[in-house]
A protein has these predicted regions:
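Acidic, small-polar-rich N-terminal luminal/periplasmic segments of exported/outer-membrane proteins
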Residues: 3, 32, 52-191, 592
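Outer-membrane beta-barrel translocator/receptor signature
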Residues: 156-159, 170-248, 256-262, 319, ...
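Acidic/polar loop-and-plug regions of large Gram-negative outer-membrane beta-barrel proteins
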Residues: 231-236, 248-255, 259-328, 344-394, ...
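Membrane-embedded beta-barrel scaffold of Gram-negative outer-membrane proteins
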Residues: 326-328, 334-340, 344-352, 553, ...
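Gram-negative outer-membrane beta-barrel transporters
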Residues: 611-613, 630-716, 753, 779-783
């Protein structure tokens, strides 16, 4: 590989590259490494250098855990010299674990997960990710382009998952206060290779993936790659819930090994799932009975129970087309242009419930849970009256131009990255009208065959959201000798969000819609508004390198989320963050830390202390002269994060992380059901680990543990439901054997102790998602 002539610069010429060389690494528990890392370094007789590891079947065994960089050109330095917490989860990690979705891969990042189960009857769908105290599900990107939609993202075409913690507004524009997630897609390369996996397991889990790459004869520097996926799997420990999907991702590249390279990537995915409405919290720890439900104390329902019907469905179609053109003007200057069009369609129906109790003045049951004999548990029924429908289409078109230049001004070296982005994002939510209903079902023995006369169709009461953005950005890293770097970034986003909501007029109560003189049942426009402004986000960091393999850093960053920035919706409510008259939510993050590569730079250790202050929050405790809430609210997340990734020895790989967070509402009303000042759905402590050892015989054994502290649910009017959840620990394991260079059999085991735990809980506390029960997957990995 030909490196740049200017020392220490980051652009690498493609002229002699035949594909990205993989360096074998892994991540270990920070506390264990602190005690043993130096000893291991001294005892390792064969230091695992990149070159050596690539000669001992690292690619065949697939144990590369460590990535040195993220894929975005906006990050001008290797991870070790980047003053920010960024975790990269490589395909070697999530493939070895048998993970198939983004949510499963993110279990390798401490404190990141799907902890929120929705509001009232609305159940969250897809990758509903929380990170460092805030919802990050609308800050998910694919190859640096926002990926819209509440869907579950498959990993069959993903090279690595990049978790950027801390404000990401300078890198991506509007985003969640505490970070963003990027999925890097697989690309065609100059080699002939075929690989894939056949998987079967408990609860009728079946999956097939294939990855085929071929050079094109007669067309020098060209290659084509096709990734395929098929899956039909029930969910372990959940009756009737099913995930069925198919995907194909062809990629073709031209001009590899030349100064000008072109890539065309396509992606098509279909999902036909039976969604999970989760389980009533009746009888579990911290549940207290409402009137008439006293007999249910200590009698939780079976966590496998399914309370939906055969009519429930989650049908998703995702289509994406990407064209990328790269040109190297020299070894020190590269121009990249990326054009993408993408569309996601979702048709969703769920027979949802709210497990309320209560009795009337005569003592008869009046809630959603009813009975004929209070002492006979088999007589209890649960109403399925909160039917949820989604009929949504999201689309995006973008053109991103980036120029990366390395140069020097006197003795100071610069790694400059600058560009412009033009983006249009649209969302259409089709109104759905329903007639009929689903019958109640047994609380302790529900039957999904009990369907009623519920029907639905589009009503015409649609809502439309669109955001157009023009972005300019510049990043520069200044190197003052070998020991000191300063990295800065500045981004300006000129955006315009337009939103129109239509509704069927009429009705009574708080959801009544004024007809304005029109006949009842007429479709009327309730909101037609827009928001337009310029966001300025920036970050500044400094790195001191006492030695080449270590970095000490400090960083400060500002990120903003404007009204409607997360969901394209605007509101005329004075208490809504989506009111276009309000200022953007602003996040300020301070971070100091250290990064150190030990064991001949094969093992990366990381320590970060961080604090994020989120301001311009709605504060109903502080009213203006008109009696309206003000934006004096403030939230804070601060803590420590430890992680490590790499090889302890040539054959011992490990990945682990630990975080301890203190979350709080600094100004404003408490938002938790138990009245504590914490933020909701955010564990204050979490640990994750995964380690494997490869024997010369071809046998690999490994496993890991993950710990998640309890969660505080949100505040609403629900009574008696759990206000918080308990902590839990889960143990997983893997055993594999390479029969030949071409075939490896792998057995994954999850939740070895069959721990029964609450993985997420909804805002009112009526429903919870049980954790995955003990599961086994047997896979055949092949490679030619």
């Amino acid at each position: 590989m030909t490196k740049l002539k200017t020392p220490g610069t980051h652009i690498v010429s493609k002229k002699s590259s035949t594909g990205r060389r993989l360096t074998a690494t892994a991540l270990s528990s920070a506390m264990m490494i602190a005690a043993s890392g130096l000893t291991v370094a001294e005892e390792a007789s064969s230091p695992p250098t990149s070159k050596k590891l690539n000669t001992v079947r690292i690619e065949a065994e697939g144990i590369n855990y460590k990535a040195d960089r993220v894929t975005s050109p906006k990050f001008t330095q290797p991870l070790r010299d980047t003053p920010q917490t960024i975790q990269v989860i490589t395909k070697e990690v999530f493939n070895q674990q048998g993970a198939s979705t983004l949510t499963e891969a993110l279990r390798n990042s401490a404190g990141v997960g799907t902890f929120y189960a929705g509001e009232n009857g609305n159940t969250t769908t897809g990758d509903a990710i929380y990170m460092r105290g805030f919802d990050t599900s609308n800050s998910i990107f694919v190859d640096g382009v926002r990926d819209i939609g509440s869907i579950s993202r498959d990993l069959f075409n993903v090279e690595q998952v990049e978790v950027e913690k801390g404000p990401a507004g300078t890198d991506n524009g509007r985003s969640a206060p505490t970070g963003a997630i990027n999925l890097a897609s697989k690309q065609a390369f100059l080699a002939d290779a075929t690989s894939g996996t056949l998987t079967t397991g408990t609860d009728s889990q079946n999956r097939v993936t294939a990855d085929i790459n071929r050079t094109l004869e007669g067309l020098a520097g060209s290659a084509v790659r096709v990734n395929l996926m098929w899956q039909d799997s029930d969910v372990a420990g959940r009756d009737h819930v099913n995930n069925s999907r198919f995907g194909i991702a062809p990629s073709i590249a031209f001009g590899l090994d030349t100064d000008t390279r072109a890539y065309v990537n396509l992606l098509y995915i279909e999902q036909d799932n039976v969604p999970d409405g989760f389980v009533p919290t009746v009888g579990i720890d911290h549940w207290e009975p409402q009137a008439g439900l006293e007999a249910l104390v200590g009698n939780p329902v079976d966590s496998e129970n399914f309370y939906g019907t055969r009519d429930d469905h989650d049908e998703v179609t995702a289509t994406m087309a990407t064209f990328r053109l790269e040109h190297d003007f020299s070894d020190n200057a590269r121009l990249t242009n990326t054009v993408r069009w993408g569309k996601t369609e979702q048709d969703y129906q769920l027979s949802a419930f709210m497990s309320t109790g209560g009795t009337d003045e005569d003592g008869n049951p009046s809630g959603n849970i009813r009975w004929t004999d209070p002492n006979d548990l088999s007589s209890y029924t649960l109403a399925r009256s909160n039917n949820t429908f989604k009929d949504i289409e999201n689309s995006i078109v973008t053109d991103q131009l980036n120029l990366a230049v390395d140069f020097a001004t006197g003795s100071v070296e610069h790694n400059l990255s600058t560009g412009i982005e033009l983006t249009r994002e649209k969302q259409t939510s089709y109104g759905v009208a329903s007639t009929g209903s689903q019958p109640a079902t047994s609380l302790y023995n529900p039957d999904w065959n009990e369907t009623g006369d519920l029907t639905s169709s589009r009503s015409g009461a649609n809502s439309y959201g669109q955001t157009d953005t023009v972005s300019l950005y510049v990043f520069d890293t200044l190197k003052f000798g070998e020991n000191f770097l300063v990295t800065g970034g500045l981004r300006a986003d000129r955006y315009k969000t337009q939103y129109r909501n239509n509704a069927v007029c009429g009705g009574t109560g708080r959801r009544a819609v004024d007809c304005g003189g029109q006949p009842e049942g007429t479709i009327v426009t309730t909101i037609d508004d827009e928001a337009e402004d310029t966001l300025i986000n920036w970050k500044l960091g400094a790195v001191y390198k006492p030695v080449k393999a270590a970095s000490l850093y400090a960083n400060y960053a500002i990120s903003q989320q404007p009204p409607g920035g997360s969901n394209f919706q605007l509101s005329d409510s004075v208490s809504s963050a989506n009111n276009p008259n309000l200022d953007p939510q602003e996040a300020k993050t301070y971070e100091v830390g250290a990064k150190w590569d030990v064991v001949q730079e094969a093992l990366s250790l990381n320590l970060a202390l961080f604090r994020t202050d989120v301001t311009n929050e709605i504060n109903s405790n502080d009213l203006d002269e008109q009696g309206n809430p003000t934006q004096s609210g403030e939230k804070r997340v601060e803590g420590v994060e430890l992680s490590a990734v790499g090889n302890i020895t040539e054959n011992w790989s490990v990945t682990a992380g630990y975080t301890n967070m203190d979350t709080s509402v600094e100004e404003g009303s408490a938002i938790t059901a138990d009245g504590t000042p914490n933020l909701t759905y955010s564990p204050d402590e979490a640990f994750t680990s995964w380690t494997t050892y490869r024997f010369p015989s071809g046998l690999t054994i490994g496993g890991g543990a993950s710990y998640t502290a309890g969660l505080h649910r949100g505040r609403d009017g629900a009574a008696g439901t759990p206000e918080y959840t308990d902590s839990y620990t889960v143990f997983n394991a893997v055993v594999s054997y390479a029969f030949t260079d071409n075939l490896t059999l792998r057995l994954n085991a999850y939740n070895l102790s069959d721990e029964d735990y609450v993985a997420s809980i909804n805002k009112s506390g009526y429903r919870y998602a049980p954790g995955t029960s003990r599961t086994f997957l047997l896979s055949a990995d092949f490679r030619f």
